[in-house]
């Protein structure tokens, strides 16, 4: 998770999906109670870490999802707070919106048209723009990923050494 994102505390929501999981797996009341205790501990750990502005681990969220609890991005209503029913709502705090104004530059690899961060399995726009310039010169058994026709007019790729003056002593 990015350090710039801020999450508020979460609340758990027992859903029909959770009830169906419990019924299909023939869980006893004590097993269901154990699951709720584990879910409460995960949520408390999540909330504790976010309040201290620590990085929140994915394991808590995965564990909650494995137990069948759903995390929602809306706060509890006043009516739900007064009812205090057995259903608990462990919800994920909404992320702060980043201001992409003229004053704040986008973080590396991000753009308004492409909000995905550069990372594994993702080509940044800079790499995508230059990938058409490279021609394939490998063995004939390997097929090229991108092949540009020979008749296409394109400029040779600039080297990082082009800007260095030749009379360096």
Curated annotation (Swiss-Prot):
Residues 137-169 are annotated as: Disordered. Keywords: Cytoplasm, Nucleus, RNA-mediated gene silencing. The record marks 61 as: May be required for interaction with erh-2. It is found in: Cytoplasm; Nucleus; Cytoplasm, Perinuclear region. Its main location: cytoplasm. Residues 137-151 have a biased composition (Polar residues). Coiled coil: none annotated. GO terms for cellular component: cytoplasm; nucleus; perinuclear region of cytoplasm; RNA cap binding complex. Expressed predominantly in the germline (at protein level). Disruption phenotype: RNAi-mediated knockdown results in defective activity of the PIWI-interacting RNA (piRNA) silencing pathway. RNAi-mediated knockdown disrupts the localization of tofu-6 to the perinuclear region of the germline. RNAi-mediated knockdown does not cause chromosome segregation and cell division defects in early embryos. GO terms for biological process: 21U-RNA metabolic process; piRNA processing. Component of the pid-1 variant of the PETISCO complex (also called the pid-3, erh-2, tofu-6, and ife-3 small RNA complex) containing at least pid-1, tofu-6, ife-3, pid-3, and erh-2, which is required for the biogenesis of a class of 21 nucleotide PIWI-interacting RNAs (piRNAs) that possess a uracil residue at the 5'-end (also called 21U-RNAs). Within the complex interacts with pid-3; the interaction is direct. Within the complex interacts with erh-2. Within the complex interacts with tofu-6. Component of the pid-1 variant of the PETISCO complex which is required for the biogenesis of a class of 21 nucleotide PIWI-interacting RNAs (piRNAs) that possess a uracil residue at the 5'-end (also called 21U-RNAs). Within the complex acts as an adapter which binds to the complex via erh-2. Involved in the biogenesis of 21U-RNAs which guide the piwi protein prg-1 to its DNA targets for silencing. Plays a role in small RNA-directed transgenerational epigenetic inheritance. This is Protein pid-1. The lineage of its organism: Eukaryota, Metazoa, Ecdysozoa, Nematoda, Chromadorea. The gene is pid-1.
């Amino acid at each position: 998770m990015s350090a710039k994102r801020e999450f508020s505390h979460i609340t758990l929501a027992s859903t029909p999906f959770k009830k169906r999981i419990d019924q299909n797996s023939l869980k006893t009341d004590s097993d269901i109670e154990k699951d709720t205790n584990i879910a409460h501990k995960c949520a408390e750990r999540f909330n504790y870490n976010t309040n201290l502005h620590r990085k929140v681990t994915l394991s808590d969220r995965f564990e909650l999802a494995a137990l069948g609890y759903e995390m929602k991005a809306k706060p509890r209503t006043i009516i739900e707070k007064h009812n205090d029913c057995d259903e608990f709502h462990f919800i994920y705090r909404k992320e702060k919106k980043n201001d992409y104004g003229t004053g704040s530059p986008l973080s590396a690899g991000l753009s308004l048209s492409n909000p995905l961060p550069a990372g594994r399995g993702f080509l940044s726009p800079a790499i995508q723009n230059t990938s058409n310039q490279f021609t394939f010169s490998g063995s004939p058994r390997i097929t090229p990923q991108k092949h540009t026709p020979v008749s296409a007019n394109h400029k040779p790729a600039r080297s990082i050494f082009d800007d260095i003056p030749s009379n360096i002593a």
